[in-house]
Amino acid sequence: MATSAPGVPSSAAVREESPGSSWKEGAFERPYVAFDPDLLALNEALCAELLAACHVVGVPPASALDEDVESDVAPAPPRPRGAAREASGGRGPGSARGPPADPTAEGLLDTGPFAAASVDTFALDRPCLVCRTIELYKQAYRLSPQWVADYAFLCAKCLGAPHCAASIFVAAFEFVYVMDHHFLRTKKATLVGSFARFALTINDIHRHFFLHCCFRTDGGVPGRHAQKQPRPTPSPGAAKVQYSNYSFLAQSATRALIGTLASGGDDGAGAGAGGGSGTQPSLTTALMNWKDCARLLDCTEGKRGGGDSCCTRAAARNGEFEAAAGALAQGGEPETWAYADLILLLLAGTPAVWESGPRLRAAADARRAAVSESWEAHRGARMRDAAPRFAQFAEPQPQPDLDLGPLMATVLKHGRGRGRTGGECLLCNLLLVRAYWLAMRRLRASVVRYSENNTSLFDCIVPVVDQLEADPEAQPGDGGRFVSLLRAAGPEAIFKHMFCDPMCAITEMEVDPWVLFGHPRADHRDELQLHKAKLACGNEFEGRVCIALRALIYTFKTYQVFVPKPTALATFVREAGALLRRHSISLLSLEHTLCTYV
């Protein structure tokens, strides 16, 4: 196959329609509404394909790393399947790490080669395959104004959505939907099957729509273009250079965290980020210089005495939405819970969930069955036409590591668990559902108000959840899903999300309910079309918080896995605390969160 860049097929994921299209009849008759849970039911085969794409692929130990793969993640020794839960704290309290794996034992999977191939997506000098796919469609078929409007709607929703596994999965599904909506019937071109052949990966979606945000227009600082006297830049393109430095930090951290999957989540455990063997020198330098990176993308830089910031504006808008939603509580707004079930499907059996139950086990079993079936169904297409970088995983022996679960869909992409928490926050995923966004705000307020005495915030969580469970009127009308998900997360994860973790706190600020939930509905066609046209013509895709806070997040979360030397850790805690205070974000001890949770 001809290539236009090293390892990038010139045809990308563009493919003529297969004889049996998996879209349900009438799937493209409705007007497109981004992040609509009902869309997931229109193509169950695509959902299963994406679930499989969210998994790490293991190969037999004898398989060698493809010579064409260039990566800084060395292949790790094979591990027994199911060992991931025992890494760094185990699946539950008190679990012990087993003896080293016997290379001759049955059932071994080597996930090192796949981790090595996957990290190549996260590099500044590697093309974005989502951008490349769009460009190929543009050259081959031209992009209509209607496509631009739908794509703009998807991009706007991604900017307002939480950075989480559910959002990444939805973005992947809807990117395929938008492309097929406009090109399947007229041009017989489809993206269904592209993830199964590795022409696109879930990491490509994560990078394009969430990590780098290729469509973002504010240079990483919301409102920068609206400033009356914008800060002078030293040279043309300086803003993009500054943003690329952040992107390098975020992508380097992601590469290192993916590297932990090379040995089932245990690689680099205990290694120091300040020179330990668990990280690369480039990452160590980027982490040490995070403050310089953040300073250039900080909306509070140069301001004295705190005051207005991106987060104070976001908090005010959140309050306005909550008040408006309360006033319209009896207005019959339709609520859907498909994303609650999707969250359960993605996170059951992973370190994000620490309390098991029949519903969780059923979700994990359903996911395993769907992934296995989809992997087998696409075996022939994968062997005929796999992307060169992943060619070795198209052979008959490789298979998804069902025990690790869909960790590639998560933001941090590691399987580490500590303090009964995991890298992926279940509660951040819940922010994708309108009723849960509102319920989470009420839940936090109830925890804070529960005791007038000096009872610790942690001790207030379980009684408040108990009260919520006992009062059906106080719950969203979701058949008990919300309370079940809170129980599954556990009090430690709730405590971490609400009061401790800067990633969760900043995600709460990033999620824009006006963008996610405040647009015209599908049955208001004219208003919806006007809304999408304004998004497309305005070309103002601004984030809600400045990228300086994202730089802090990636440094913080990497330091939780690759613990730095004490001096570097103390410096980071001091500088990170100052940045959070300037943005009016109040959290419990960062030292506690760094050392206790993950």
UniProtKB/Swiss-Prot annotation:
Primary localisation category: host cell
Transmembrane segments: none
UniProt-annotated stretches for the region Zinc finger 3: 310-583
Region (Disordered): 1-23, 66-107
Keywords: Host cytoplasm, Host nucleus, Metal-binding, Zinc, Zinc-finger
Subcellular location: Host cytoplasm; Host nucleus
Region (Zinc finger 2): 425-504
GO cellular component entries: host cell cytoplasm; host cell nucleus; viral envelope
Residues binding Zn(2+) 2: C425, C428, H497, C504
Residues given in the record as Zn(2+) 3 binding sites: C310, C311, C546, H583
Family: Belongs to the herpesviridae UL32 protein family.
Function: Plays a role in efficient localization of neo-synthesized capsids to nuclear replication compartments, thereby controlling cleavage and packaging of virus genomic DNA.
Protein's recorded name: Packaging protein UL32
